Amino acid sequence: MANSRNKSSNELAVHGAQQAIDQMKYEIASEFGVTLGPDTTARANGSVGGEITKRLVQMAEQQLGGGRSKSLS
């Protein structure tokens, strides 16, 4: 029997974080020269999404490690 408390994988774990994620998305898209929209290629959108993930992981590592993280580049 499925657990009705399971969250969708697309739901944010922190309520109110959507605005910060959206801001990060548009900042990264601008840095990469990507105009987000329906005509943007999956590859371009994926590069933005991948960079968001990379930066969020780096931020989490810094918090967990007391600010000591390696560069992901």
UniProtKB/Swiss-Prot annotation:
Site-annotated residues for Cleavage: E27, I28
Keywords: DNA-binding, Sporulation
A single GO molecular function term of this UniProt record: double-stranded DNA binding
GO biological process: DNA topological change; sporulation resulting in formation of a cellular spore
Keyword Disulfide bond found: no
UniProt superkingdom: Bacteria
InterPro entries (UniProt xref): SASP_alpha/beta-type, SASP_alpha/beta-type_CS, SASP_DNA-binding, SASP_sf_alpha/beta
Protein task: SASP are bound to spore DNA. They are double-stranded DNA-binding proteins that cause DNA to change to an a-like conformation. They protect the DNA backbone from chemical and enzymatic cleavage and are thus involved in dormant spore's high resistance to UV light.
Other observations noted: SASP are degraded in the first minutes of spore germination and provide amino acids for both new protein synthesis and metabolism.
Family assignment from sequence similarity: Belongs to the alpha/beta-type SASP family.
Annotated protein name in UniProt: Small, acid-soluble spore protein C5
Naturally occurring in which organism (per UniProt): Priestia megaterium
Gene field: SASP-C5
